[in-house]
């Protein structure tokens, strides 16, 4: 027999989970392509032509910033490293901070300029600093896109500028933008200290930066992320916001006006926050399993992975959690060894099954340990 522990979660947890794609009926979006995704689980809540390949303009820089943050977090480059502007970087058009050839600036200030003001010259300078050239950096961008499953994407440059013939092949989709936005915001949260800035300066306060993402100032909970515009791409935006422990990613490509992109993302975010919630159900109490011939008598078990799932606020079905643990386990026990299963279900339907695993290793008793244990039991049995 297996020990069964049941928990009924009331009201706030009385809601069935959503599948990885649960796109529903939401607001009308004024864009060629759009998508709303939950950052924690990757669940798609809304989509409109989400896999159509379109030019993303400066939303491209989400991938540029991702690779920069990965280089920083891995120790390849440092926040205070000095970056020197090349002739190529200084010649970039579009949004910029007007770097001069040979001008130096820290990684921090250049990344801030990219995140806040969409500076193409700084994006190129950082790309060259990391990979040696923009072309080499673009290879890294496409490699990372492939690793993330961005199957609709091909990058040609690190900026999103599309004013030359080669840039006709620079395409991605709303879905792919959500994927890279999720990777950046979830795994490299330090980027938010830049993407939430409304106004700031660089060059010792002599050059002002104003965020191109107006939601930073006007939408509660905004955490980022990146705007984009060219004549070919139209107005684009990857917008992220967090409320009540849930972070959402809203993407639009090809809006006709700047107001359309902000309003469309705002409406999608409003829809998501109004209709869904992220919950983290956990088994009640502690769960242990007796260890046969172990140097300790029991071993504790916990869920092997995050139990978070998205729930629809409109539904009120009970969620049941069952934890079934093995009656015993023979030593040696490895840390992370499966000792049972946590099952989350609703309305008789299994939503998730998560392994319960050992929190620590337990060594097997040696001959002398067994001998002493037997001797102790004999002595205790003879006591009056």
Model-derived features with residue positions:
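Residues in and immediately flanking transmembrane alpha helices
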Residues: 15-16, 74, 280-283
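Domain-terminus/edge residues, biased toward the C-terminal soluble/receptor-binding domains
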Residues: 150-151, 168-384
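Structural motif marking the loop-to-transmembrane transition
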Residues: 1-2, 56, 107, 367, ...
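Intrinsically disordered, low-complexity repeat and linker tracts
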Residues: 14, 21-22, 287, 384
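Active-site-adjacent loops and short helices of periplasmic peptidoglycan-processing enzymes
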Residues: 20-181, 185-188
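Positively charged n-region of N-terminal signal peptides that target proteins for export
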Residues: 1-9
